[in-house]
């Protein structure tokens, strides 16, 4: 007999959530028909139901780490043991998977937001993801790809400079602005300075030609 909760390989998050909801609705229906044999079972499931509902609402917004969900649910004053039971259920249903969560977090934020490996590692650590899982997720980022990402950030920031610096002081101020954009994303200081200077000099040359 097929387990109605266990997802099939390749199912996306929305499909897995829908499958879990269907299984839970079926369980509730059987309870109402008297299939749940004891008052204790019904009371236990009722307590879990609200925790599960809150967890699914959070997962509807975006994928989350187990630790992140644990913290959010704990802040709502739910019983710790019930939270753990619900999180175990969701883990078995593959709706919580720190490995997949970390891989996707790194992939999206490195490509779309220009984040460095250092910042991504810190973000995942803050979400309670284990060091080994973080390291495997960060292996996706090739050092040369990270340099290309940093270069793109520097070029974008340098393009916001609308005039040629009047003097050295002006140039240094503009350079600090470009370096700051890289530093906020966690790129190494030496690389940030080199790329910022390169991007700013290219921007100044472009302004001179126009």
Curated annotation (Swiss-Prot):
Q: Name one GO cellular component term.
A: cytoplasm
Show the segment(s) annotated as Disordered: 28-47
Q: Which GO terms describe its biological process?
A: regulation of DNA repair
What Pfam families does the entry give?
Answer: RecX_HTH1, RecX_HTH2
Q: Name the UniProt key words of this record, in alphabetical order.
A: Cytoplasm
Subcellular location as annotated: Cytoplasm
Q: InterPro entries given for it?
A: RecX_HTH_1st, RecX_HTH_2nd, Regulatory_RecX, WH-like_DNA-bd_sf
Per its UniProt record, what NCBIfam families does this chain match? Answer: PRK00117.4-3
State the function annotated in the UniProt record: Modulates RecA activity.
Return the similarity comment: Belongs to the RecX family.
Name this protein carries in UniProt: Regulatory protein RecX
